Amino acid sequence: MLEIIYQDEHIVAVNKPAGWLVHRSWLDRNETVFVMQTVRDQIGQHVYTVHRLDRPTSGVLLMALSSDVARMLSLQFEQHQIQKTYHAVVRGYVLEGGTVDYAMAEELDKIADKFAKSDKAPQPSVSHYEALAQVEVPLAIGRYETARYSLVALKPETGRKHQLRRHMAHIRHPIIGDSTHGDLRQNRGVAQHFGCSRLMLHASHLHLNHPVTGEALTLTARWDEPWQGLMSQFGWSGIAPHLERVEFPLTASQDNE
C-alpha cells in the first residue's frame, strides 16, 4: 500500500516512492508496479493524473478523482498557481540561496521522442534554491581528500523536463544519484560508502487552492528510509523534522534514468 497523505471526494495525494512509474508505459514493458493502478486498487475508484514526477523522484503526487476536477487542477498547474517545494542533496557547498535563470533546450527521449523536432528554441526556465545544511566528510572521491555535500530546498518557477536536475548541474552542484546530469563518481561514492543509491530529489510540498472548495492546502510528503539514513550519516537529522519518518512496505526497481 502507498502512503495516502490527503484524500477527499475530489482529490487524492500520495507519497510516491523513488523508482516507481506513475502509470504504465510502453517504454518499460517489464515493469509491473505503477502508482496509478496501486492507488486505484487501494481506494477502489478511478484516478486521473494532473502532473508527473520522474521515475527516480519521490514525494507528493496529486491525482483527481473525476475528469472535471482533473481539468481544473491541470489548468492550475499550467497557470503556475500551484507551488512546489523539493529537497535535494547536491555536490559541494551551497552556502546561500539564489535563483537559476537559465533557458533550456527541450530534452528529447531517444525512443519516446524519436519523431519530435530537435531544433526548438531554448525555453525560459527559472528555479530558486535555498541552502539548508552542509557537510564535509573524509572521503576521497576524485582529486580531493574530502567530499562536500549540501542539503537544499528547491522551488521551480517553470516546469521543464528535468529542470531541477539540469539547473543544479548548470551551477556545478549536481544532485547526488543523478546518472544523467550528475557526477557519476560522487554517485558511486555515496552508494558505496553511505548505502544510498537513489536520486536525492524529493517533492516535499505542494501548495494549492482546492479546485472545488477553494481551501488553501499544503500537501507534505515525508522522506523515505534511504533518504533519512543519509541525513543521519551526514548529521542532518532534525533539520526538517516535519519531513522525517516514512517506510514503504512495497519495493520497486530503482531507476536513476
UniProtKB/Swiss-Prot annotation:
GO terms classed as biological process: enzyme-directed rRNA pseudouridine synthesis; tRNA processing
Alphabetically ordered keywords of this record: Isomerase, tRNA processing
Domain of life: Bacteria
Catalytic activity field: uridine(65) in tRNA = pseudouridine(65) in tRNA
E.C. number(s) listed in UniProt: 5.4.99.26
InterPro entries in the record: PsdUridine_synth_cat_dom_sf (IPR020103), PsdUridine_synth_RluA-like_CS (IPR006224), PsdUridine_synth_RsuA/RluA (IPR006145), RluA_PseudoU_synthase (IPR050188)
MF terms in GO: pseudouridine synthase activity; RNA binding; tRNA pseudouridine(65) synthase activity
Keyword Isomerase attributed: yes
Alphabetized Gene3D superfamilies for the sequence: Pseudouridine synthase (3.30.2350.10)
Residues at the active site: D54
Cited NCBIfam families: PRK11112.1 (NF008321)
Function: Responsible for synthesis of pseudouridine from uracil-65 in transfer RNAs.
Similarity comment text for this entry: Belongs to the pseudouridine synthase RluA family.
PANTHER family, sorted: MITOCHONDRIAL RNA PSEUDOURIDINE SYNTHASE, TRNA PSEUDOURIDINE SYNTHASE C
UniProt name for this protein: tRNA pseudouridine synthase C
Lineage: Bacteria, Pseudomonadati, Pseudomonadota, Gammaproteobacteria, Enterobacterales
